[in-house]
Amino acid sequence: DVIPDGPTTPEIAYQMVKDETFAQTQPRLNLATFVTTWMDDYATKLMNEAININYIDETEYPRIAVMNAKCINIMANLWNSPEQAQWKAGALAIGSSEACMLGGVAAWLRWRERRLAQGKPVDKPNFVISAGFQVVWEKFAQLWQIEMRQVPLTQEHITLDPQDALKMCDENTICIVPIQGVTWTGLNDDVEALDKALDAYNAKTGYDIPIHVDAASGGFILPF
């Protein structure tokens, strides 16, 4: 666990990594994975040729920034975004975990801004999610010190039950997180039913609790 005194040849370094990872699960046999396990040769070629490009540097790589914006537009149009702007609002993420982090932070900041404007405390935020969450939500709760309230999954309710979720909400709830492709079962939480129930709840309580949909694996399927 220390930096070696001398260099290692590329061949040996390669073999060391191959040997270290040999016994672990092969990606194509991992039914729990959320990533692509096979790509066309041209996709692999493009990735290899772009491996040294720091795409976040839009000044030096402006065409990649345009391509990113086009991808956001495609997603916005797919989901019938009402935005009229040429370039729709959105953000790119390396994977679903980063997307969850960004969505959670956005919900927390909106809640915090609203509470501060009302002169109310902001020290006890929480969010509501089913017990079938992916692990990034636990990390989000730990990193940002936000209470995670878990709605149990039962034989009667094998996806997020809207009424059970609402029972866990209060004025400090930054959002409710339905999941599309629950890790345990692959099933989808009913976003439409939750949205209707939450609209009624917000109207009754005066709260403004939003929904953040964790698209997970279901986000690749539901639009089609």
PLM feature spans:
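Conserved PLP-enzyme active-site core in the AAT-like
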Residues: 95-224
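N-terminal entrance/gating region of PLP-dependent enzymes' catalytic architecture
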Residues: 1-88
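Conserved aromatic-histidine-acidic binding/catalytic patches
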Residues: 55-63, 88-95, 125, 182, ...
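Short loop-beta-helix segment that forms the pyridoxal 5′-phosphate
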Residues: 75-103, 151
